[in-house]
Amino acid sequence: MKNKFYLHEFQIFDGEAWITFNIVDLNELKNEISVAITNRGKITVVTYDLYKDENGYYFEYGCEYTKININDFKEIK
């Protein structure tokens, strides 16, 4: 699954701007995901805990713990 999602992209609107996530690393053994986050022109790479529910794998983003589902990421060509 690691290479399947490499650099796949997802965008979310936070009420003011679009935030873009790109998967850099997905480690099921450690239950971690590293994503490059582009937020208002600033790019950061952050590692989050990876969770699983009935809809698949996800991580929680921001102070409101927004659920970001891995299956929502799309390959950019």
Model-flagged regions — what are they?
Residues 4-15:
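Short aromatic-glycine-(Arg/Gly/Cys) micro-motifs in beta-strand/loop hairpins
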